[in-house]
Amino acid sequence: MAGERPPLRGPGPGETPVEGPGGAGGGPGRGRPSSYRALRSAVSSLARVDDFDCAEKIGAGFFSEVYKVRHRQSGQVMVLKMNKLPSNRSNTLREVQLMNRLRHPNILRFMGVCVHQGQLHALTEYMNGGTLEQLLSSPEPLSWPVRLHLALDIAQGLRYLHAKGVFHRDLTSKNCLVRREDGGFTAVVGDFGLAEKIPVYREGARKEPLAVVGSPYWMAPEVLRGELYDEKADVFAFGIVLCELIARVPADPDYLPRTEDFGLDVPAFRTLVGNDCPLPFLLLAIHCCSMEPSARAPFTEITQHLEQILEQLPEPTPLAKMPLAKAPLTYNQGSVPRGGPSATLPRSDPRLSRSRSDLFLPPSPESPPSWGDNLTRVNPFSLREDLRGGKIKLLDTPCKPATPLPLVPPSPLTSTQLPLVASPESLVQPETPVRRCRSLPSSPELPRRMETALPGPGPSPVGPSTEERMDCEGSSPEPEPPGPAPQLPLAVATDNFISTCSSASQPWSARPGPSLNNNPPAVVVNSPQGWAREPWNRAQHSLPRAAALERTEPSPPPSAPREQEEGLPCPGCCLSPFSFGFLSMCPRPTPAVARYRNLNCEAGSLLCHRGHHAKPPTPSLQLPGARS
């Protein structure tokens, strides 16, 4: 059909990706830069906001509002994470790029991208159980096997993430989501906006600390002190989550006892734990909260210990046959055992199948628990003005260029012996062939054919068993071997998503309903007080970098040499506010002249135009437009 755009697809078997006329490659025969492939894949997975209805606000965060939506064509229920701040655009793109490359049952599944009024919004799977924080604060009974399974799910997700060479940096009970299915619970890890490549500190080389980011209650002591830190910071955050699971208390120091050096107050914490708690489970939580990072075990060993604890746990007894204690342990009763982490607790009664924290509701925020007459409650986060009591979120620079995170395995870790039960043999993971590539590792992947753009039964998403380990070193001299590009799992009629055009600009309104705001209202972008003189304090330069990101410079003369990795403008009218220069590693400004085929939203060039309809259908319920 004349005037119709050919379908977007990746290179087929035996094909070598080359640039078309006027492309960034400078002519036919040159390989396409990875930024172009990432951009084209992002355009192919775009959705319009008015493709969804039944919008219900289910939560809000520091940068976004979360809506439960239903796709009109497929009827699939998803979660739309609408970005509220234009300055957070690059962090959102980093999160989308990373989630699009992760495939694991305990990692939140990425469904697609939605663009509305110049803002990028992520579409993820819907978790009907809410957050782990909401589950623990509810009166829902949770037996010890259920809690151990939740902890194992989170540990397996983080083990997979660390194996890809990336660590989370913002692991909290707010960012762990729960799915209810078949009378049980499954936990997944989400919110990868602060994820970073695992650093490698070599002897003799200059060691520059990473930025101080995260939620203070879950941040490791070395992070709060501005020291060097790595993936072991996630282990400390996991230990705080385990303490929340064991005692069913919030991470607030008014409920979860902490020391003045941001550690866990072990004697005071044990007063919150009933005698029925499995001792290895408690010791694992204490071990993960070690002050010394080298003393914390990696997640490969943590998952092994959790699996062994589950195997050794006695069979649960029906609730009707459970003997109730005469005087159940409450938050203000019990003595404080001394002797450090190695002090033993009374042996648990094998007849008990549920935690004693299920016998009464969690404490209300108005009545913090008491830890004994001889203990003083300490909130170390209130002693520093920059932390503001811990009810904030520390950020690096929300507007810095989005550097894709390479998904490569980190260097071998030194095994750390856990002072717990005897460990089984190490989990043997099958080795997968290493494929070397020159593209940005976290760039979205292209669908091979046009079938993902049309409604109908689509292929199932690629599972973890079919993926490859990526060895994406920028200095690799080997070209990428030709082969079929893996398909991007988009939601069609099953778990995929359809390809549509860009978003319209009409405003949206949400269905009235209860709003669950689980995050504090304050956001801090700078580093802790007193670090302004340090040369590595990158967080204090956020405002100049934000202005630099929005600035557009004229394009270079045609005769100037061009590099292969250069920033490309978005070809779609929906992405005109974007520069998309941060998709590339090239620091040169974005050219002002569009060099690709125009992807405007005229009816003649749409991938899926509406036929003879005079007007596009209007949504019954609308989402509020993002502020640009």
UniProtKB/Swiss-Prot annotation:
> What is the reaction catalyzed?
L-seryl-[protein] + ATP = O-phospho-L-seryl-[protein] + ADP + H(+); L-threonyl-[protein] + ATP = O-phospho-L-threonyl-[protein] + ADP + H(+); L-tyrosyl-[protein] + ATP = O-phospho-L-tyrosyl-[protein] + ADP + H(+)
Give expression by tissue: Weakly expressed in sciatic nerves (at protein level). Highly expressed in testicular germ cells. Expressed at low levels in brain, lung, heart, liver and kidney.
Documented activity regulation: Activated by autophosphorylation on Ser-215. Kinase activity is inhibited by SPRED1.
Q: Which residues bind ATP?
A: I58, G59, A60, G61, F62, F63, S64, E65, V66, K81
What does the entry say induces or represses the expression of this protein? Induced by fibronectin-mediated cell adhesion of Schwann cells. Induced by sciatic nerve crush injury, expression peaks 2 weeks post-injury and returns to normal at 4 weeks post-injury in the macrophages of promyelinating Schwann tubules.
What residues bear Omega-N-methylarginine in this entry?
Answer: R338
| Result, substituting S215E | Loss of autophosphorylation site, no effect on kinase activity
Chain intervals with Gly residues compositional bias: 20-30
For the region Required for interaction with PARVA, what residue ranges are annotated? 529-626
Q: How is it modified after translation?
A: Autophosphorylated on serine and tyrosine residues.
Instruction: Give UniProt keywords alphabetically.
Output: ATP-binding, Cell projection, Cytoplasm, Cytoskeleton, Kinase, Magnesium, Manganese, Metal-binding, Methylation, Nucleotide-binding, Phosphoprotein, Serine/threonine-protein kinase, Transferase, Tyrosine-protein kinase
Q: Which SUPFAM superfamilies does this one have?
A: Protein kinase-like (PK-like)
- Active-site residues (renumbered): D170 (proton acceptor)
Subunit structure, as described in the record: Interacts (via both C- and N-termini) with SPRY4 (via C-terminus); the interaction inhibits TESK1 kinase activity. Interacts with TAOK1; the interaction inhibits TAOK1 kinase activity. Interacts (via C-terminus) with SPRED1 (via C-terminus); the interaction inhibits TESK1 kinase activity. Interacts (via C-terminus) with PARVA/PARVIN (via C-terminus); the interaction inhibits TESK1 kinase activity. Interacts with YWHAB/14-3-3 beta; the interaction is dependent on the phosphorylation of TESK1 Ser-439 and inhibits TESK1 kinase activity. Interacts with SPRY1, SPRY3 and SPRED2.
Q: What family does the entry list?
A: Belongs to the protein kinase superfamily. TKL Ser/Thr protein kinase family.
- Which PANTHER family does UniProt cross-reference here? DUAL SPECIFICITY TESTIS-SPECIFIC PROTEIN KINASE 1, LIM DOMAIN KINASE 1
Protein's recorded name? Dual specificity testis-specific protein kinase 1
